[in-house]
Amino acid sequence: MKILFPRKKHLHFIHIGKTAGTALKNALSDYTDSRHAQIYLHGHDFKLTDVPDNQYCFFSIRDPLDRFVSAFYSRQRQGKPRYNSKWSAAEELAFSLFETPNQLANDLYSDNWKKRVNAEYAMLSIRHINNSYWDWFIDERYFLSRKKSIVFIFDQTSLNSDFEEFKKLFSISKKALLPNRNSVNAHSNNVSFNTKLNKVAELNLKRWYAKEYVFIELVKKTF
């Protein structure tokens, strides 16, 4: 998704968890200084509020349901093989209660209060699942006040074509390539994982992540 060509060269990556950020950072790590941009590849703690007013940023988005499934399996395997990020005590309990993302999502609004409470606990305890796009962009008013700072938005569903467009826009070397989906550097889930959600799970997640869809629609409407 092309936005604007910046006059300034300082370009900051806002890394939202489980939106293909690791793959993008890996692809750009050797090409952060191009003719049109000096790129800064930040960690998850860097937000829109950290971008200086006279500088620019880019980030990637992903459907909240897909992001949920990806986050579940990523944390279930503790980030391996690329990382080895141990569970928190809360995550350990959550994964003792739920083996699949579909099981967790199904119980979110269960009539059985024990299932519902356990599901809510897991949703609030598992890293990436328990954060929001708004954690990085504050609120709609602030996001819109900084829209001129946002020069490119990747969509996980069109990542390859978006990346080619990004390279052309900022004169980044053609040698910069996204890692193969199954490589460690991509930090993606094993294709053998059961990523399917049934209808109840989908409806529950759309209800739970209602504010996330507000953000996605705001991005599409604004850019």
Sequence positions of predicted segments:
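Membrane-interface amphipathic segments in extracytoplasmic regions
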Residues: M1-F223
